C-alpha cells in the first residue's frame, strides 16, 4: 500500500499555512529617499576605422571558412592550426594593398581565430581570470562582475544575429538546442562554466545570455577564510559535520556562493565513499575518485526524452550511493532527497534558494507539495526534522562581498512547529569607505546536538568552539 495518495489539488488550508503561520499587521514606516541612481557610461561609438576593421574581419572569416577544411582543422594541434591560419590571413591581408598595419593584422588574426574556433567576442572575457560572471543583456551591452562589482565592458557583438550564432554554438557543444519552440536553455562550457541563454519571443530586446564562471583550480575552505567568507572556527565545525555524515542544506540567493561552498565542503568527504551528483547543468567539481556525475536532459525536438532531477534521484538510489549531492533542489525531487536522507544516505547535501535558514524550511515544505503527494504539514515537518541536520545561509552583501551569514541546526519538533537554533551568525554593523559590508561573527553559545555524533566518529573539536563569544577573523 502506498504511504501517500497521489493527487494534484490546490493546497489545503492547513498546507497554506506552511510559508508563514503568523501575518504581521502593516506598520507605518518612515519615508526614505531613494539612493542616487548610478550612472553607467556607455562605450563610445565605433570610429570609421573600427567599422572598417570589423567589416574586414567578417570578410576574412568568410574567406577562411570557404578556403579551409574546417573538419580537418579541428583534429589538428592548436599551434598547427594557428600557424596555417596566420599564413592565410597574411595572404588575404596582402590583397588589401597595405591598408592594414602589422599590429592591426595581429589583432585581426586573434579575433578571426576566436570567431572561427572559439566564442567570438566572449573569448577575451573568458581568458580574464578576474571575471566571475558575464551578463549579455543584448548584442551591444555586455556586463561583467569583477570582485563582487558589476561593470559594463567594452565587448560587443556585431548584431543580434552574431550573438545568436554564438549562443547556438555554445548549446550545440553539449547536444542541446534553442529555438522558438524551446527559447530557453541551460548549458556549460568546456571549463565547467554554467550558461543560461534566452531568445525572442521571450527576450524582448534580442538574445540574452548569462555565464557563471568557475576557476580552473577549485577553491578550498581555507580560501574562503582568506576571502572573509567566514572565520576558521566555522570552518572547523562545517568540516567536522561533513566528515560525521551530517545532512546539510545550503541556502542563499542567486550569486551568493552556494555552489562554491558546496564544492568546498565536498572536499571533506572520505575518498572511499561512493558519491553520486545530480545537476541540471553540471558545475560541481568534486575531487574524490569514486564519483558518478549525472545530468538532466530536456525534451528532444519531438517533445520526448526528458529526464528530470526527480528521475535521476530515483535511479541513483539503485546505484548504491553512500552520499547523494543535488546541485540545487527546485521542485518535487526535494521529497525524494529527504526520503533518501532518512533511509541510510547520510551525509547528503544540496542547495536551495531562500533568504534565511528559517525561510529555507518553509521553502522545503513548498517544494514537497510540488511532488504531487498530499502530505499533512506535520508529517512534512517531521520528515524535514529527521532528515536535515545543518542549514547554512550564504548571502551576497552590500558591495558584492559574499559571506556565510548563519549556521543553524534543526533540533526537532515542538508540537507542530519545526525548531532550530543558530550556532554561528554574522552581524552586519554597516559599510566601510569602499561601500563594502562590515560586521562581526558571533558564536551563540549553543552546543549542537550533532556534536556527540561528531565525537563518536573520532573527530575532536576545540573545547571552546561553541563558547558564546565574538569570533576573531
Language-model segments: residues:
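P-loop NTP-binding catalytic core
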Residues: 128, 136, 141-244, 462
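P-loop NTPase switch/communication element
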Residues: 215-226, 263, 267-314, 360-364
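Hydrophobic anchor at the beta1->P-loop junction of P-loop NTPases
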Residues: 250
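Conserved P-loop NTPase nucleotide-binding/switch module
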Residues: 279-292, 316-413
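Active-site phosphate-binding and catalytic loops of NTP-dependent enzymes
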Residues: 72-75, 95-102, 117-128, 170-187, ...
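Conserved lysine of the Walker
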Residues: 258
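NTP-binding/hydrolysis catalytic cores, primarily Walker-type P-loop NTPases
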Residues: 403-473
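N-terminal anchoring/assembly modules that precede and organize ATP-driven motor systems
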Residues: 1-151
Amino acid at each position: 500500500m502506498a504511504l501517500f495518495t497521489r493527487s494534484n489539488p490546490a493546497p489545503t488550508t492547513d498546507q497554506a499555512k506552511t510559508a508563514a503561520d503568523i501575518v504581521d499587521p502593516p506598520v507605518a514606516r518612515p519615508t526614505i529617499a531613494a539612493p542616487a541612481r548610478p550612472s553607467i557610461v556607455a562605450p563610445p561609438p565605433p570610429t570609421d576605422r573600427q567599422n572598417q576593421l570589423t567589416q574586414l574581419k567578417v570578410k576574412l572569416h568568410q574567406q577562411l571558412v570557404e578556403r579551409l577544411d574546417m573538419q580537418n582543422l579541428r583534429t589538428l594541434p592548436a599551434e598547427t592550426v594557428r600557424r596555417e591560419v596566420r599564413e592565410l590571413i597574411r595572404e588575404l591581408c596582402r590583397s588589401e594593398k597595405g591598408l592594414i598595419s602589422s599590429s592591426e593584422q595581429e589583432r585581426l588574426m586573434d579575433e578571426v581565430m576566436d570567431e572561427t574556433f572559439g566564442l567570438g567576442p566572449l573569448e577575451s572575457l573568458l581568458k580574464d581570470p578576474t571575471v566571475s560572471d558575464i551578463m549579455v543583456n543584448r548584442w551591444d551591452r555586455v556586463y561583467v562582475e569583477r570582485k563582487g562589482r558589476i561593470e559594463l565592458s567594452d565587448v560587443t557583438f556585431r548584431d543580434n544575429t552574431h550573438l545568436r550564432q554564438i549562443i547556438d554554438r555554445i548549446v550545440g557543444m553539449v547536444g542541446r538546442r534553442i529555438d522558438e519552440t524551446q527559447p530557453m536553455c541551460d548549458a556549460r562550457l568546456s571549463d565547467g562554466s554554467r550558461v543560461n541563454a534566452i531568445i525572442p519571443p521571450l527576450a524582448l530586446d534580442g538574445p540574452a545570455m548569462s555565464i557563471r564562471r568557475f576557476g580552473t583550480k577549485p577553491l578550498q575552505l581555507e580560501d574562503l577564510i582568506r576571502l572573509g567568507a567566514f572565520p576558521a572556527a566555522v570552518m572547523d565545525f562545517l568540516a567536522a559535520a561533513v566528515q560525521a555524515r551530517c545532512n546539510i542544506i545550503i541556502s542563499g540567493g542567486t550569486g551568493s556562493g552556494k555552489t562554491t561552498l558546496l564544492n568546498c565542503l565536498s572536499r571533506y568527504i572520505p575518498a572511499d565513499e561512493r558519491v553520486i551528483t545530480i545537476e541540471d547543468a553540471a558545475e560541481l567539481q568534486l575531487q574524490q575518485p569514486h564519483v558518478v556525475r549525472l545530468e538532466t536532459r530536456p525534451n528532444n525536438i519531438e517533445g520526448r526524452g526528458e529526464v528530470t532531477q526527480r528521475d535521476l534521484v530515483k535511479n541513483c538510489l539503485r546505484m548504491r550511493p553512500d552520499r547523494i549531492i543535488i546541485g540545487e533542489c527546485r521542485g518535487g525531487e526535494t521529497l525524494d532527497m529527504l526520503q533518501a536522507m532518512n533511509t541510510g544516505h547520510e551525509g547528503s547535501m544540496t542547495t536551495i534558494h531562500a533568504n534565511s535558514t528559517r525561510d529555507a524550511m518553509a521553502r522545503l515544505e513548498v517544494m514537497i507539495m510540488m511532488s504531487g503527494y498530499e502530505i499533512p504539514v506535520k508529517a512534512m515537518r517531521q520528515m524535514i526534522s529527521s532528515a536535515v541536520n545543518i542549514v547554512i545561509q550564504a548571502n551576497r552583501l552590500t558591495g558584492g562581498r559574499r559571506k556565510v551569514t548563519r549556521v543553524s541546526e534543526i533540533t526537532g519538533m515542538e508540537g507542530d512547529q519545526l525548531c532550530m537554533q543558530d550556532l554561528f551568525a554574522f552581524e552586519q554593523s554597516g559599510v566601510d569607505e569602499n561601500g563594502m559590508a562590515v560586521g562581526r561573527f558571533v558564536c551563540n553559545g549553543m552546543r549542537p546536538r550533532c556534536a556527540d555524533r561528531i565525537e563518536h566518529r573520532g573527530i575532536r573539536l576545540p573545547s571552546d568552539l561553541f563558547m558564546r563569544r565574538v569570533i576573531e577573523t
